[in-house]
């Protein structure tokens, strides 16, 4: 069981080399994420289209494929207080991933080096590159 953040999901969905490493790490795992995960990932896919890294059609396909990932989305409300407590070292969005990982007692998988180096929490954070 793991928590997957948006940076790792985007790499996975865009089939980058880091995404291949994420796919290997996810094998056999039950994947969890906070509810805002979808908005973050779809926003990043949109940015890939805007930057012409992928076509509009490819973006639509990636979104459809993303929405079919077997990820358990958790409501934000139970984790918002902890996410706010992490405000001095994390964005609220990142804090929600950390809070969920802490709450479930499972690793947080990320491709975000800054998040992987963060402190002030009890989560195990794995940087996948």
Curated annotation (Swiss-Prot):
It holds the Pfam family PIN. This is Ribonuclease VapC12. Gene3D superfamilies: 5'-nuclease. Keywords: Hydrolase, Magnesium, Metal-binding, Nuclease, Toxin-antitoxin system. Its EC number is 3.1.-.-. The keyword Cell inner membrane does not apply. Belongs to the PINc/VapC protein family. Toxic component of a type II toxin-antitoxin (TA) system. An RNase. The cognate antitoxin is VapB12. It comes from the Bacteria. Mg(2+) binds at residues 5, 94. It comes from Mycobacterium tuberculosis (strain CDC 1551 / Oshkosh). Its cofactor is Mg(2+). One of its GO terms (molecular function) is RNA nuclease activity.
